[in-house]
């Protein structure tokens, strides 16, 4: 059995689609999956900047600070900031001739 069940043929009324076994559950499932795939692909292309920005930046939050005293939260923020601040003396400048 072939999954290619739609055949366009020239009929008396013009070009038409003759579907064989269109009530086959496999054909119905494949059609539904194909339509859902197309819809998801279109949505992905329309909103890819929002979606991937959310994954890139939204999931990079620090650990939860729920239940931690404010002084410890501030200390943690300061440690994170110090880890980001880098002394320029650690880098080597290479000049190409």
Swiss-Prot record:
The record marks 37 as: Essential for channel activity, possibly by being protonated during channel activation, and by forming the channel gate and the selective filter. One of its GO terms (molecular function) is monoatomic ion channel activity. Pfam families: Flu_M2. The record marks 41 as: Seems to be involved in pH gating. It comes from the Viruses. GO terms for biological process: protein complex oligomerization; symbiont genome entry into host cell via pore formation in plasma membrane; symbiont-mediated suppression of host autophagy. Residues 60-80 are annotated as: Disordered. Keywords: Disulfide bond, Host cell membrane, Host membrane, Host-virus interaction, Hydrogen ion transport, Inhibition of host autophagy by virus, Ion channel, Ion transport, Lipoprotein, Membrane, Palmitate, Phosphoprotein, Signal-anchor, Transmembrane, Transmembrane helix, Transport, Viral ion channel, Virion. The modification Phosphoserine is found at residue 64. It is a single-pass type III membrane protein. One of its GO terms (cellular component) is virion membrane. Residues 1-22 are virion surface. Gene3D superfamilies: 6.10.250.1640. It is found in: Virion membrane; Host apical cell membrane. Cytoplasmic tail plays an important role in virion assembly and morphogenesis. Homotetramer; composed of two disulfide-linked dimers held together by non-covalent interactions. May interact with matrix protein 1. Forms a proton-selective ion channel that is necessary for the efficient release of the viral genome during virus entry. After attaching to the cell surface, the virion enters the cell by endocytosis. Acidification of the endosome triggers M2 ion channel activity. Belongs to the influenza viruses matrix protein M2 family. This is Matrix protein 2.
